[in-house]
Swiss-Prot record:
Gene this protein is translated from: accD
Class of the enzyme per the UniProt entry, highest EC level: transferase
Cofactor info, note text: Binds 1 zinc ion per subunit.
Protein name: Acetyl-coenzyme A carboxylase carboxyl transferase subunit beta
Entry GO terms, CC: acetate CoA-transferase complex
Length: 289
């Protein structure tokens, strides 16, 4: 029996009914071969090298939100095409492709949930929709989430995974950087916590605005975080970049973020921080002082 035949027999015997060899996943970092159910159980973290893979929005929801507590808001908001923008495709076409791919109308889900028992407003970026880019709808959803947090005296968690501002909306998308930053300033004035969670990747206009305005900034291990890409920076300055540049570990070492938290500990960490920094959560009587 040749190796190819042996491998087919091995995977066929290991797989249960209805499964196939495609259910084996290779780690992008260490090339370890893992069974897909093991990967799911580990929140898409390699058990061999601890590499944190990119995961779907639905997996993020399951990982962070207490079961059955998420109430989505503003799901009906959809981007328009005020500039009739066309690159290789029209913007309208890209929006439709994003809808078909994700089943959602924008790159952001916003809503209210409980995280380890603590009620909070939450905003989750979806990289599968146009690279998680920030457009006018996404900015509006963030502002509305801030408004609800202010109204209900809750904290806010924003999970970023984005390539930056959406070029197809030009100045409209760039305006969201100032718009979201101004809204978050009101949350800060109200002494309500904003926790910014940076995941791979968090780049461009997102990193240059609300992603780094958190009262507490947390990153996942190995996340790529920055403004311009490393290659562009290297070509611009004409010099080599430090080892590990634009990684979460590099940012922590240089004091730009507060902590790096593994995925399996993220929910408890967020719940503890929200409970500790929001005085209204445990003491609702403070609302009347």
């Amino acid at each position: 029996m040749g190796f190819a035949d042996f491998f087919k027999t091995f995977t066929r015997e290991r797989a249960k009914e209805g499964e196939s060899p495609s259910h084996w996943i290779k780690c992008p970092s260490c090339s370890a071969l893992m069974y897909y159910k093991e990967v799911i159980a580990q929140h898409h973290v390699c058990p061999k090298c601890n590499f944190h893979m990119r995961i779907a929005l639905e997996d993020r929801i399951e990982m962070l939100c207490d079961e059955g507590t998420l109430i989505e808001h503003d799901a009906s908001l959809e981007p328009t095409d005020p500039l009739t923008f066309v690159d290789k495709k029209s913007y309208k076409k890209r929006i439709e492709e994003g809808k078909q791919k994700t089943g959602r109308a924008s790159s952001v889900l916003s809503g209210e949930c409980r995280i380890n028992g603590v009620s909070t407003q939450i905003v989750l970026f979806n990289f599968a929709f146009m690279g998680g880019s920030l457009g006018s709808v996404e900015g509006e959803k963030i502002v509305r989430a801030v408004n609800r947090a202010l109204e209900k005296h809750q904290g806010l968690v924003i999970l970023s995974t984005s390539g930056g501002a959406r070029m197809q909306e030009s100045t409209y998308s760039l305006m969201q950087m100032a718009k979201t930053s101004a809204a978050l300033a009101r949350l800060s004035q109200a002494k309500l916590p904003f926790i910014s969670l940076l995941t791979d990747p968090t780049m461009g206009g997102v990193s240059a605005s609300f992603a780094f305005l958190g009262d507490i900034i947390i990153a996942e291990p190995g996340a790529m975080v920055g403004f311009a890409g490393a290659r562009v920076i290297k070509q611009t300055i004409g010099a080599d970049l430090p080892e590990g540049f634009q990684t979460a570990e590099f940012l922590l070492e240089h004091g730009l973020i507060d902590m790096i938290t593994p995925r399996k500990e993220m929910k408890k960490t967020l719940g503890d921080l929200l409970r500790f920094f929001n005085p209204y959560d445990e003491n609702p009587c403070l609302l009347h002082l």
